[in-house]
């Protein structure tokens, strides 16, 4: 199925041929206008109406139309030719001329500049047309450039070499068709001359020869053109529509198919509209580059069910029909063996001091050269971006590994880095930030930054200082020295370090000499060796020169940092507040990133730490990281402008002075960041001054004057283990500002900006903030985001929060206010379309939610090895938005099920899901963080929790409760140990809880059933319990781990078991949360699963009662001590069908708004013999299928169709089966206080709701033996119902309470006590036989009342008294005893007056004598006959009632409210 298709509206589909014959006088009747000399395609002007038009060989065809572009004339490609050449071709034709023309469109119009400004895939029709245009242009034109001639180049032949002014003048005059920059130099393609030189016109034969493709026919200057051609090859992933033209032009190198000369020339970029408007002032900026496999590479056919297609703009993309997705990447490229990064060479194979841009990039990498954000690299395979050249990065890492291996056998002595070593990594000159218009590289525009090796040539103030080396070094950081011709300058000072205490150093000072050794021209590695040789306690003399500002952004993560902390021999290195010892050599090599492209860029697009996720060997903690987490003192010089200094200040929330609240004028405040603490203003300490005093001091500075600020950056307080020691109240005063994003340093990078680290599995701390912060603190968009916005919408981006996926449909633009986190918005959601093929077992996922109006629908359990699991894109917790294009937001669960059933018939489904995007967003100081894990808190990756099976009887979503500060609360902010927002102040801490032998831990944990991304939190702390006494827990705190075991992706039951298995001591890892949100959830009885850690003393005589969850309620479990004999809460049984079925019956189902419960166990049946199942246990899965929202009939069908075996997953109940409450409607059975399930146990011998129950034999209508025996348990009327005891519900302490009193109500007892008091009625399933006396008593009762009962049955349908008795109210308020007395009174009324007055003594005596006269054998025979007769009557009544029940279930005929719904029994099925 590998084929190439094109969009119907692509211009190639509009191309047509037309043959025009000359008239009698030789006239053609077609006017040709335009031409390259006018910057236009040749196009058709006026056309004579009488001219014939047709295809060669006869036949009618489309006619030429005015305005159509001419692509070929008589087989000669004329695009890019001047008009006089086109007319020459036409004149050379004799009788007829064949034209190939196309109608103009939005992409292809007569403007040559517009078309050349676009980028297309190599080999596409658009790319070929561009090459034709350039071929034809170079017949008459010579490209121009501002660079100096190279050896062998001939001016006027290879290039026209111009000055920058001449070039800009030429561009402004409109003479150039293409303009661009490459390596800091301007290149342009001029228009051909308006008249042919010397009157010569290229003949048709010559054009045919030139366009034949032979290298011998190529003009001499095509050498330069070949460079341009190779440099202009780009991949369609960088393709963009006309609305973003500045991203569409690039001239970068493709080393895949060039000879040894090509890349050195790589010139002549296409025109860029942004350059036309304003020339680029940073010549080091480049444009995107991608290295697709060239046409010469033998990739073979596309994989099965893949096809290649073109967009209407000529962009190539690939369609995967297996998953119904599209991709820009060629799948053959992904499968091709990749060359290791460190083995990629420059095109000549020799390492010289060539630019990194001349290094070969591996397949799948793209180099982006953005006019605004500088140069960065995109790894399309691993979905990540970074500023550093990946080849250089890999080479450096390999070199570091080799050095470390060499140093392992002996004490590490750093190898001296010479220029020969440094040349292995091509040096790059420093760059300039965007605010500095001066270029970084040597160009005709501006020279390279001043450098000298002679100290006498330095201009500025010389400073001498002497520093004593402490155990932590000298206390300053150095940048620069990436190449020999670069200064080493002071970046920042470490707070309280020797340099800061000395007070002489400032940011930007150039290090001239160290101990009288001139270091001008030294590399950073050489300086490392010098500083390392100085022992601790010794002093060093430094000579500095002030007056040279840093020529690049010091906070660029690619900038090399040389710090005194890292270059000490076996000195303690402070890393994240802990002292460690490391090799000085390894640290000297880890002092930062060897510079790649330190061009102007506002922020880093990549987290340069987490190198292990790059697929490269992971370094140890980098030096820059260790320094970045320490307080730094930075000197900033700001000139006061007409509107002030360009920043605002506010009181520091933690005290200590004034902090920078907001950067208003970032170019003016270069080097200053939001959150910086102002220490000094013009050498005067202002930390003790008030806010107004500092403001007045700044106001007094005259406009135009320079102010020197000493600011402290970083050094945030580290919290103790217990959050009790930290003030949790948030400080919201007008003069109090919170930290900005940039003021919080990541533990993994020296950059204050949170860069992008994109992998399918990611840590949220490494995910990008929605917008980054540049060196001046202002919000800047992510460069990858800018790049991704230039993409077409054909590809489904992955769901991981990569910069590309951050632009997926449905994602909101989010803005982080760096001055007030009270307004900070948690990143929103992103959507994705997922196409799944159905397997034999289904689509492989389950659906939750949709039970209430407006309730979201979520993806539940992902079945292992199912279709969804194999595809890998769908996750538990994803919100379902659409099913096959049908929106399901706010729809019912049933509708989604129906849609999925329809999709199952088709064999595939297209799902649109929405997933919350979690980024690392630092919070303000003293702000209560959301209970979420972060890189501070736990080692496990934080992700959306995948609930394998949440066995709670609930489906509804747990709504996120906002704490009012813009952050989500504990319940809705993360999964069990899952993702959330990062707290910069509060960290997770461990809490150990010990309990006594006769007590529980004393806490309730809350887990969201239908919101897998919600965490597991404390819902209640029991007063006086061990949890309360420890003083470290509060409601809302979230649990991250139990006894060191992460609960990420663990279900509620797994967490329960972890705590239960802990014994008398449990250690919990906690992150503080929000108490109010959880309290609200508990009091509102939300559908959450709770666990009570109470414990019943073993001395208690009665067993503690445990109720089972009812639908849409809380489920509670107890943690009993190990000495308490009880079974696990959850268990699995596998039953084999017996002669009469599986031996159990069910109650419940979705149609009754109940979960499924075990109602009865057949005597000596398989279920009873297995020894695990008990009455009241909740059935969670049947043969692997969840019972959530399962109908009663579906459960029967699963069991019957499962063959000889059935596998059940159950949750232990308390022996009571919940009743159905018809008044609750969709709210399910009534709940008790605090959402505790209310259970009204009745005599287990009665059957509360036959309509909700089923038992299962293969013989559907045969009654089992135990059913026959149960027939005598009916009341005198044959009613097998028992009414609930209305106001009794069991607590978790095993006690019950009566809220109402009734005169005839039996004494309240727990189920065990009930069974103890009535042994003959303990077994609901009839597992215990009644005593012979009780059976004989039942026989006599049946014998005496059968006739009267049969007569009464015929009348009770019309009896008003009966109807009243059957009302729900009467049913609720009547106990079995009261019903029996009422029945006796009713029967008594039917007797004759004589009988009501009481029979005569003689009659009573005769009756007694007759009973005495009967033999035991006769009584047993009569009893057996009567039982058989009763069973037949009851069976017939149940069948009739079942039919009535089905009719009453119809939506069009709802059951009458006065009649008792679901009373009558449907056919009892024995399993």
Swiss-Prot record:
GO biological process: endothelial cell morphogenesis
Domain of life: Eukaryota
Keyword Disulfide bond: no
Role summary: Plays a role in coupling actin fibers to cell junctions in endothelial cells, via its interaction with AMOTL2 and CDH5. May regulate acid-induced ASIC3 currents by modulating its expression at the cell surface.
Gene: Magi1
Pfam families the UniProt entry points to: Guanylate_kin (PF00625), MAGI_u1 (PF16663), MAGI_u5 (PF16666), PDZ (PF00595), WW (PF00397)
Binding residue positions for ATP: 103-110
Keyword RNA-binding: no
Pro residues: bias regions: 427-437
Domain PDZ: 17-105, 464-546, 635-713, 833-915, 990-1074, 1132-1214
Compositionally biased region (Low complexity): 734-744
Name this protein carries in UniProt: Membrane-associated guanylate kinase, WW and PDZ domain-containing protein 1
Biased composition (Polar residues): 578-594, 931-943, 951-960, 1092-1110
């Amino acid at each position: 199925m590998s084929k190439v298709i094109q969009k119907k509206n692509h211009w190639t589909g509009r191309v047509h041929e037309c043959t025009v014959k000359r008239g009698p006088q030789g006239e053609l009747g077609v006017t040709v206008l335009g031409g390259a000399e006018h910057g236009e395609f040749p196009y058709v002007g006026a056309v004579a109406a009488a001219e014939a038009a047709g295809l060669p060989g006869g036949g009618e065809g489309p006619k030429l139309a005015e305005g159509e572009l001419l692509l070929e004339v008589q087989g000669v490609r004329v695009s890019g030719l001047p008009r006089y050449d086109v007319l020459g071709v036409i004149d050379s034709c004799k009788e007829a001329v064949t034209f190939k023309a196309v109608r103009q469109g939005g992409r292809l119009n007569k403007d040559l500049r517009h078309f050349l400004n676009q980028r297309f895939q190599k080999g596409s029709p658009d790319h070929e047309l561009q090459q034709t245009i350039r071929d034809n242009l170079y017949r008459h034109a010579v490209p121009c450039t501002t660079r100096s001639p190279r050896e062998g180049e001939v001016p006027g032949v290879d290039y026209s070499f111009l000055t920058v002014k001449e070039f800009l003048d030429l561009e402004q005059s409109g003479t150039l068709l293409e303009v661009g920059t490459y390596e800091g130099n301007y290149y342009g393609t001029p228009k051909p001359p308006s008249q042919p030189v010397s009157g010569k016109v290229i003949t048709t034969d010559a054009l045919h020869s030139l366009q034949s493709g032979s290298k011998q026919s190529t003009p001499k200057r095509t050498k330069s053109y070949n460079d341009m051609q190779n440099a202009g090859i780009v991949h369609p992933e960088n393709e963009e529509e006309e609305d973003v033209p500045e991203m569409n032009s690039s001239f970068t190198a493709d080393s895949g198919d060039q000879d040894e000369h090509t890349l050195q020339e790589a010139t002549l970029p296409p025109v860029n509209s942004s350059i036309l408007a304003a020339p680029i002032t940073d010549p080091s900026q480049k444009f995107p580059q991608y290295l697709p496999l060239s046409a010469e590479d033998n990739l073979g056919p596309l994989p099965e069910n893949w096809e290649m297609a073109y967009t209407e703009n000529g962009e190539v993309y690939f369609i995967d029909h297996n998953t119904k997705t599209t991709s820009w990447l060629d799948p053959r490229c992904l499968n091709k063996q990749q060359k290791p990064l460190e083995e990629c060479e420059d095109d000549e194979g020799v390492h010289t001091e060539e630019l990194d841009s001349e290094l070969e990039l591996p397949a799948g990498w793209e180099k982006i050269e953005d006019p605004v954000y500088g140069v960065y690299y995109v790894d399309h395979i691993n979905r990540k971006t970074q500023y550093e050249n990946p080849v250089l990065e890999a080479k450096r890492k390999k070199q570091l590994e080799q050095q470390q291996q060499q140093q392992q056998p002996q004490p590490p002595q750093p190898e001296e880095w010479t220029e020969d070593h440094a040349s292995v990594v091509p040096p790059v000159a420093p760059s300039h930030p965007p605010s500095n218009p001066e270029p970084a590289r040597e160009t005709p525009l501006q020279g390279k930054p001043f450098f000298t090796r002679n100290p006498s040539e330095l201009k500025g103030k010389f400073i001498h200082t002497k520093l004593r080396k402490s155990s932590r070094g000298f206390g300053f950081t150095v940048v620069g020295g990436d190449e020999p011709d670069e200064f080493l300058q002071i970046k920042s000072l470490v707070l309280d370090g020797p340099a800061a205490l000395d007070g002489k150093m400032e940011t930007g000072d150039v290090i001239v000499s160290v101990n009288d050794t001139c270091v001008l021209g030294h590399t950073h590695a050489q300086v490392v060796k010098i500083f390392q040789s100085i022992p601790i306690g010794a002093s060093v003399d430094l000579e500095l020169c002030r007056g040279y500002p840093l020529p690049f952004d010091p906070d660029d993560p690619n900038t090399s940092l040389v710090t005194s902390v890292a270059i000490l021999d076996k000195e303690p290195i402070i890393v994240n507040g802990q002292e460690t010892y490391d090799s000085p050599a390894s640290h000297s090599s880890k002092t930062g990133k060897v510079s790649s492209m330190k061009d102007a860029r506002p922020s880093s697009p990549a987290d340069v730490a987490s190198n292990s996720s790059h697929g490269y060997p992971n370094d140890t903690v980098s030096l820059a990281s260790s320094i970045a987490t320490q307080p730094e003192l930075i000197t900033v010089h700001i000139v006061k402008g007409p509107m002030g200094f360009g920043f605002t200040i506010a009181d520091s929330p933690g005290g200590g002075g004034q902090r920078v609240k907001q950067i208003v004028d970032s170019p003016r405040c270069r080097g200053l960041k939001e959150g910086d603490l102002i220490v000094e203003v013009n050498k005067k300490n202002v930390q003790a001054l008030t806010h107004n005093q500092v403001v007045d001091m700044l106001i007094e500075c005259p406009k135009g004057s320079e102010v020197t600020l000493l600011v402290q950056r970083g050094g945030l307080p580290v919290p103790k283990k217990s959050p009790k020691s930290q003030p949790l109240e948030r400080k919201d005063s007008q003069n109090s500002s919170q930290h900005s994003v940039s003021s919080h340093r990541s533990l993994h990078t020296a950059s204050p900006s949170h860069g992008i680290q994109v992998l399918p599995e990611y840590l949220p701390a490494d995910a990008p903030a929605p917008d980054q912060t540049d060196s001046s603190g202002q919000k800047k968009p992510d460069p990858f985001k800018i790049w991704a916005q230039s993409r077409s919408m054909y590809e489904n981006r992955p769901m991981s929060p990569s910069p590309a996926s951050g632009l997926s449909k449905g994602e909101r633009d989010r803005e982080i206010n760096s001055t007030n986190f009270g307004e900070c918005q948690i990143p929103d959601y992103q959507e994705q379309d997922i196409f799944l093929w159905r397997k034999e077992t289904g689509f492989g996922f389950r659906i939750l939610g949709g039970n209430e109006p407006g309730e979201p629908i979520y993806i539940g359990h992902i079945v292992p090895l199912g279709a969804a699991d194999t595809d890998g894109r769908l996750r538990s917790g994803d919100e379902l938005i659409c099913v096959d294009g049908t929106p399901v937001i706010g729809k019912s669960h049933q509708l989604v099920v129906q849609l999925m059933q329809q999709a199952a018939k088709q064999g595939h489904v297209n799902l649109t899901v929405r997933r919350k995007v979690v980024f690392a967003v630092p919070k303000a100081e003293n702000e209560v963080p959301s209970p979420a894990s972060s890189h501070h808190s736990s080692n496990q990756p934080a992700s959306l929790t995948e609930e394998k099976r949440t066995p709670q009887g609930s489906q509804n979503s747990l709504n996120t409760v906002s704490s009012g500060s813009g952050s989500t609360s504990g319940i809705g902010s993360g999964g069990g140990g899952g993702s959330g927002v990062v707290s910069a102040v509060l960290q997770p801490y461990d809490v150990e809880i010990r309990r006594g032998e006769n007590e529980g831990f004393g806490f309730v944990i809350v887990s969201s059933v239908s919101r897998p991304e919600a965490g597991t939190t404390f819902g209640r702390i029991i007063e006086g319990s061990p949890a309360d006494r420890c003083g470290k827990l509060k409601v809302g705190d979230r649990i991250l781990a139990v006894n060191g075991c992460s609960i990420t992706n663990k279900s509620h039951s797994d967490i329960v078991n972890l705590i239960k298995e802990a014994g008398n001591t449990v250690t919990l890892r906690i992150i503080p949360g929000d108490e109010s949100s959880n309290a609200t959830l508990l009091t509102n009885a939300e559908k959450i699963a709770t666990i009570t850690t109470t414990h019943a003393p073993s001395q208690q005589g009665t067993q503690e009662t445990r109720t089972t969850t009812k639908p849409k309620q809380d489920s509670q479990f107890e943690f009993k001590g190990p000495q308490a004999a009880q079974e696990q809460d959850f268990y699995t049984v596998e039953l084999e069908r017996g002669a009469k079925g599986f031996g159990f019956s069910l109650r419940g189902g979705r149609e009754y708004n109940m979960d499924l419960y075990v109602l009865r166990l057949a005597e000596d049946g398989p279920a009873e013999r297995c020894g695990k199942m008990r009455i009241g246990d909740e059935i969670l899965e049947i043969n692997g299928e969840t019972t959530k929202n399962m109908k009663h009939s579906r459960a029967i069908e699963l069991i019957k169709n499962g063959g000889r075996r059935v596998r059940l997953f159950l949750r232990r109940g308390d022996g009571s089966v919940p009743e159905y409450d018809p008044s609750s409607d969709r709210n399910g059975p009534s709940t008790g206080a605090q959402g505790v399930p209310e259970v009204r146990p009745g005599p287990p011998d009665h059957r509360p709701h036959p309509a909700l129950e089923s038992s299962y034999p293969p013989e559907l209508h045969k009654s089992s033996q135990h059913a026959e025996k149960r027939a005598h348990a009916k009341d005198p009327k044959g009613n097998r119902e028992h009414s609930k005891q209305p106001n009794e519900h069991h607590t978790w302490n095993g006690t019950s309470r009566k809220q109402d009193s009734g005169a005839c109500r039996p004494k309240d007892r727990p189920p065990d006590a009930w069974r103890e008091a009535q042994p003959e009625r303990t077994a609901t399933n009839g597992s215990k036989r009644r005593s012979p006396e009780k059976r004989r008593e039942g026989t006599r009762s049946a014998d005496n009342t059968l006739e009267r009962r049969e007569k009464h049955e015929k009348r009770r349908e019309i009896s008003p008294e009966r109807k009243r008795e059957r009302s729900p109210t009467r049913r609720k308020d009547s106990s079995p005893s009261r019903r029996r007395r009422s029945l006796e009174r009713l029967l008594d009324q039917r007797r004759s007056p004589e009988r009501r007055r009481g029979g005569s003594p003689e009659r009573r005596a005769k009756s007694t004598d007759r009973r005495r006269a009967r033999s035991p054998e006769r009584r047993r025979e009569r009893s057996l006959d009567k039982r058989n007769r009763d069973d037949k009557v009851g069976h017939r009544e149940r069948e009739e009632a079942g039919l009535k029940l089905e009719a009453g279930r119809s939506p069009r005929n709802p059951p009458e409210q006065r009649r008792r719904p679901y009373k009558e029994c449907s056919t009892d099925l024995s399993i």
